[in-house]
Amino acid sequence: MKNSPTVEKLIESFTLLPGVGKKTAERYTFFLINQKNKNKILYLSKHLKELVNNIKSCNICGYITEKNICNFCSDSQRDHSTIMIVADNRDVYCFEKINHYHGLYHILGGLIDFSRCIKPENLNFNSLKDRLKTIKEIIIATNSTLEGEITATYSKKFLKKYLKDEKIKITKLAYGIPIGLDFNYLDEKTLCNAINNRNNFKGENE
């Protein structure tokens, strides 16, 4: 027996979300169908449309914003001499939750992953060149997965190529972060220690 095309399309749509398989997608779909108060569905639909129509990337760092410049880049109270390079928007969310880092960010839009054909040129590296003039420190904050380490190494080489001032520090989050673990699963203390104890990350021969 087949469901209606509308139901099947919604089930298929839910499977696009990370970690959502067919059974979970079916559960979500029939939960919505069984809602007596259809306003809940309309509420969800409204905010999904707003997400599509209102959210874009910051012209400077690539973080999510509803304006051309995000709240971090436009905040004069932030430390504009420090940039933390992260893979995606969720990483920024993790660091902001601990309220321990007060510099700026640069979002790459992913990690280098040759198995998925994600190369350096597919990520947001080029716009980083324009941000190096007034910087004193750049923190490379990719996770400790294989892809994260490859991206960190490439980031270091990229920065060394374009940095004219050798006094600018290139640092990396301290080890102690479990290998292969996403920032989203780390507690506040671990993240704070990783920032506080970050290491010099200039080059193999230095």
From Swiss-Prot:
GO biological process: DNA recombination; DNA repair
Keywords assigned by UniProt, alphabetized: DNA damage, DNA recombination, DNA repair, Metal-binding, Zinc, Zinc-finger
Pfam family, one: RecR_HhH
Bilayer-spanning residue ranges: none
Toprim domain mapped to chain residues: 81-178
InterPro entries per record: DNA_Rcmb_RecR, Rcmb_RecR, Rcmb_RecR_Znf, TOPRIM_dom, TOPRIM_RecR
Domain of life per record: Bacteria
SUPFAM superfamilies, per the entry: Recombination protein RecR
Gene3D superfamilies assigned to the protein according to its UniProt record, in alphabetical order: 3.40.1360.10, 6.10.250.240, RecR Domain 1 (1.10.8.420)
Zinc finger (C4-type): 58-73
GO MF annotation terms: DNA binding; zinc ion binding
Family membership: Belongs to the RecR family.
Function: May play a role in DNA repair. It seems to be involved in an RecBC-independent recombinational process of DNA repair. It may act with RecF and RecO.
NCBIfam families given in the database record: recR
Designated name of the protein: Recombination protein RecR
Native source species: Phytoplasma mali (strain AT)
